[in-house]
Amino acid sequence: MKAVAVGTLALALTCLAVPAFAQASNDYCQGKSLTLVVGSPPAGGYDTYGRLVAEHLGHFIPGGCSIVVQNMPGAGSLRAANFLFQQGPSDGLTIGMIQPNLALDQAFNSENVKYDLRKFQWIGRIATAVETTVAWQSSPVKTIQDAKTHEITLAAATANGLTAGFPRVMNAIVGTKFKIISGYGGTAAIVLAMERGEVEGGHMGGHSLLSEKQDWVTGNKVSVLVQYSQTRDPGLSSVPAMVEFAQTPEQKKILSLFAATTEIGRTLVAPPGVASDRVAALRAAFAAMANAAEFRADVEKRKLELNVLSGEALEQMINSSLDISPSLAKVAEKAWTGQK
């Protein structure tokens, strides 16, 4: 995915100019350590990005500081989000990396939600987490329009996860006929099921598809039916984003909520009470890190995706996505869970 990552980065960095005022002052971190709370267990994808940031970000915070990763898994980052929101120190020495599914938990008014994403202070996004649905070459389904007239079996990991949730949303809102078969352990099992002909299609992460299974796309082994995003990823520019299938403003609002979860991606946040000048310093440090040649080289070495977005742009996206009426949020929740 080398060409994709570099091209995406070039587009994104135009928005990440480093504010001079933040560079010139605010050395609150000097001689101290900053804690990065990662709402995922060690060795996973979010942990990998968290440790990448921990190695580089401190060099760009005025005064310089070391960064210590603290893993706080639980309920898809809900535990970490609640901690940061309710107990996160306001001194700018604790930040977090939490999973984007938290937007759905908040929109669905889940009982364990103690946070409000709109009150977090967003530092920046490192990478998206765009997901796709693909159909194997033997399937008559080549487009979403085909999937509205022909039933197609899709492999999914669990009944409650995103590999089943996104296709269910397409069924409920767009009118596709995805028959979801859950119980496959993860991406590797889904890939094997398609190759063996057990199912006609499945759910794939966009980065996995382009980096590990690029021959599927270039060799026409699969048709990529949809990417679950608000805008088309540069690496999947010919694949429609899910919001493009909205026929009404209500449908667009619902689909935008789901699409935002992948666009939020791997992001850094600060607790609500951190002073504005320290938030500005963290945002400037993030922008400087994203522009740094050594950081980009490390990303390429690790074969990771890089699609950065400023904290200000993230804040706007989240506020817009969560600006949804209770009645539409209920429709969205039923679509996600498969309720009638």
What do the predicted segments below correspond to?
Residues 310-340:
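Extracellular/periplasmic bilobal clamshell ligand-binding domains
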Residues 66-74, 155-157, 178-186, 204-206, ...:
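Short beta-strand-to-loop elements that line the ligand-binding cleft
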Residues 53, 75-77, 92-104, 125-127, ...:
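Ligand-binding clamshell of periplasmic/extracellular solute-binding protein-like
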Residues 7-17:
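Bacterial N-terminal signal peptides
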Residues 28-30, 34, 59-63, 83-94, ...:
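Hinge/capping helix and adjacent helix->loop/strand transition within the periplasmic-binding protein
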Residues 35-50, 73-76, 155-162:
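Extracytoplasmic "Venus flytrap"
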Residues 18-22:
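Sec/Tat signal peptide C-region and signal peptidase I cleavage site
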Residues 100-112, 164, 168-173, 201-245:
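A ligand-binding cleft/hinge motif common to bilobed small-molecule-binding domains
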